[in-house]
Amino acid sequence: MAKLTDLVGYQDGAVVSREIINQKSGSVTLFAFDEGQGLSEHMAPFDALVYLLDGEAEITISGKPLHLKQGEMVIMPANQPHSLKATKRFKMVLTMIKA
């Protein structure tokens, strides 16, 4: 048993990730973003669910910015450009199903 927020820690000026599950059928990865850090626009071939464990983030999907807070989630559709930025430090779990 584990608390997800305890499995990945913040680092100043960095994005930290920890893969929890990596199978042919999908993956679960934890991320910790320091304030101001992010991931530049990219696409993925599969739908991905993002759930914020802590903090606040701006997630832009196909040019539309969304502001998420702790406890909120969004689905990033396959083959749609998206980016993430920490408006405050935040932790998230990214679940990608590859089926």
Q: Across the structure, where does each feature detected by a protein language model lie?
A:
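Structural motif
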Residues: 27, 56-58, 65, 81, ...
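Ligand-binding loop in jelly-roll beta-barrel domains
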Residues: 78-99
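Short, conserved beta-strand element in jelly-roll/cupin
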Residues: 32-34, 45-59
